[in-house]
């Protein structure tokens, strides 16, 4: 299928007519607030989850609705970018992305470690340290999504174009699922219905999950009705979708219709089903089989995300890792990849690079010469000071190759995630439309993070993946810290890669989640969920775990982020409804509804 490329360096018709409020583009601590241009001063509070897809409309009325919603649509488009590090209606950028991912979840998933503690607007003493400056980062991005999409969802005119309402409800709900998994409870109902002022009523993960699953049924019913629409309506809707939805690849392939949106919705349902397999095993089974039967993502051209190669922006992590020196490969990820001989570490041009400069052992004086080996930092270690390798040797630890990362998509839903979900469902005995091995091996083949339309980006991976899939045993590996700050640590990865039907369910699950973890990089949201709900992949214990809120000890992992808001009104709301909705105290060790301390099988 031919793929069309649209390279734009400026965001023409950018999503939001917005002015920044107290935003410093040189600061990693942006407040991420948006003051919307007020065209219609009315605050609409409609029924955002009600979608009447049988509604009829004339061509003239359709054009009138578009004129009425023009500002709202452009504003809502910015919410798509905010799902992956955008702000102010702009494409994803390094400041917002860093606050959303790099200063928290990326470390909790143990993809990365922060190599210096000092930032312009805050400090991070170790991985689980609660920074009042950085802890709100993911929620700040979520509020941008909410502020961009909710006014459109509540505007009465959007009911006349129900497909667009359905699509934005789906996007809002994915963002809501992700922030639920970070904090465990928030005022989802009040936010969705555009409530403007406190008090806000917190609801818990169980309520949010079950509400979203109900929405997905309505959304897919609405989109299935699209085929019954008249041709003029389909043509106008297609132009509207091409102009307003950058997360769907249809316009890049010259493709029409909404079939991919249905697959995306069902894939989200499958994800959420697996999240709650310990909390609601029978319901999880039902939801997962319903999702697969209705059709999930089956190919890479059906994936959803933000594609910098097509849209004209670079991946924010290049600036964060390479230019700023604010993140380095974690020792856990190093050990895992090296134990498995993963393609990211192999070949003439591996994705992860060797140490960037000499590293001198502080105890023995031994020197690791530049460009010797891939080396990561232990999670939880006390980082150095400053962003110069001349004074902070932690900056010489491994980074990725920026040429590969520059054009990497920022996924909302990736084929490999769906395949690994189906593989997990299959080993649980669920009808996933195929065998676990089939999904597992396809998941690995398409796990790479590189831009798919550029062959040179993934040729290295493609050349190595066949041997990788057949690797039956892990390679013996010991992590050695060249600075001598921590003792040597043998790899905790003991499984191979090759699928073996004779393996136990537990070993099969470990293989699936381990490969899913690698495939998700750098999207730490889902990786951290899987680590909490399954205990996989096996990673090194986080050092200095007790330096958070005091509820974690060595060997524990962080189960959630504390509530992000500390203003008086929010504190009152949390006391009134937040803790009850959470089901526990506002601690890092408190488990979210789906995170049950029970066996995987």
Predicted regions: what is each one?
Residues 23-28, 135, 536-537:
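Extracellular glycan-recognition regions
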Residues 111-455, 501-510, 515:
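Structured, solvent-exposed acidic/aromatic patches
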Residues 448, 457, 461-601:
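C-terminal functional modules
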Residues 1-21:
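Sec-dependent bacterial lipoprotein signal peptides
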Residues 37-55, 231-245, 366-385, 456-494:
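Charged, glycine/proline-rich intrinsically disordered loops and linkers
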Residues 22-106, 543-601:
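Membrane-proximal, proline-rich intrinsically disordered regions
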């Amino acid at each position: 299928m031919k793929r069309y490329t649209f390279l734009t360096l400026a965001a023409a018709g950018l999503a939001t007519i917005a002015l920044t409020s107290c935003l410093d583009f040189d600061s990693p601590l942006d407040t991420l607030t948006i003051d919307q241009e007020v065209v219609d001063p009315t605050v609409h509070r409609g029924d955002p989850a009600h979608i009447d897809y049988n509604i009829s409309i004339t061509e003239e009325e359709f054009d009138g609705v578009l004129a009425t919603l023009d500002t709202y649509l452009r504003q809502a488009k910015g919410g798509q970018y905010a799902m992956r590090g955008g702000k102010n209606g702009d494409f994803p950028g390094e400041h917002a992305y860093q606050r959303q991912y790099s200063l928290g979840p990326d470390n909790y998933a143990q993809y990365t470690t922060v190599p210096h503690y000092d930032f312009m607007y805050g400090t991070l003493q170790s991985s689980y340290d609660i920074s009042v400056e950085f802890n709100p980062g993911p929620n700040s991005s979520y509020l941008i999504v909410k502020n961009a999409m909710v006014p459109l969802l509540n505007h009465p005119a959007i009911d006349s174009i129900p497909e667009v309402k359905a699509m934005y409800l789906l996007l809002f709900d994915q963002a809501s699922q992700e922030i639920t998994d970070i904090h465990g409870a928030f005022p989802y109902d009040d936010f969705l219905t555009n409530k403007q002022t406190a008090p806000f009523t917190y609801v818990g993960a169980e309520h949010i999950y079950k509400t979203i699953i109900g929405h997905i049924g309505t959304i897919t019913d609405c989109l299935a009705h699209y085929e019954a629409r008249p041709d003029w309506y389909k043509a106008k809707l297609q132009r509207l979708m091409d102009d307003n939805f950058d997360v769907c690849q249809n316009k890049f392939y010259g493709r029409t219709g909404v079939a991919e949106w249905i697959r995306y919705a069902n894939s989200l349902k499958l994800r959420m089903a697996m999240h709650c397999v310990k909390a609601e095993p029978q319901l999880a089974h039902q939801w997962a089989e319903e999702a697969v039967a209705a059709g999930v993502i089956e190919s890479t051209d059906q994936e959803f995300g933000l594609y910098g190669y097509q849209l004209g922006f670079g991946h924010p992590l290049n600036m964060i890792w390479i230019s700023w020196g604010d993140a380095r490969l974690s020792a856990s990820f190093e050990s895992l990849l090296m134990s498995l001989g993963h393609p990211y570490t192999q070949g003439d041009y591996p994705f992860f690079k060797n140490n960037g400069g000499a590293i001198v052992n502080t105890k023995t004086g031994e020197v690791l010469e530049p460009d010797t080996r891939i080396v990561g930092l232990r999670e939880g270690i006390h980082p150095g000071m400053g962003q110069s390798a001349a004074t902070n040797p932690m900056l010489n630890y491994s980074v990725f190759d920026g040429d590969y990362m520059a054009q990497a998509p920022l996924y909302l839903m990736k084929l490999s995630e769906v395949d690994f979900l189906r593989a997990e469902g299959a080993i649980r005995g669920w009808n996933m439309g195929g065998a676990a091995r089939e999904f597992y091996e396809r998941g690995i083949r398409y796990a790479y993070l590189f831009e798919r339309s550029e062959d040179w980006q993934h040729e290295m991976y493609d050349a190595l993946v066949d041997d990788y899939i057949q690797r039956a045993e892990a390679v013996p590996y010991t992590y050695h810290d060249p600075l001598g700050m921590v003792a040597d640590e043998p790899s905790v990865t003991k499984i191979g890669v090759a699928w073996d039907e004779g393996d136990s369910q537990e070993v099969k699950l470990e293989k699936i989640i381990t490969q899913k973890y690698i495939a998700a990089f750098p999207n730490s949201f889902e990786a951290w969920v899987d680590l909490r709900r399954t205990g996989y992949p096996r990673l090194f214990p986080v050092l200095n775990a007790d330096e958070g809120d005091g509820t974690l000890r060595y060997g524990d992992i962080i189960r959630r982020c504390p509530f992000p808001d500390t203003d008086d009104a929010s504190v009152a709301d949390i006391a009134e409804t937040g803790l009850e909705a959470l089901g526990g105290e506002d601690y890092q060790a408190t488990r979210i509804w789906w995170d049950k301390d029970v066996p995987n099988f």
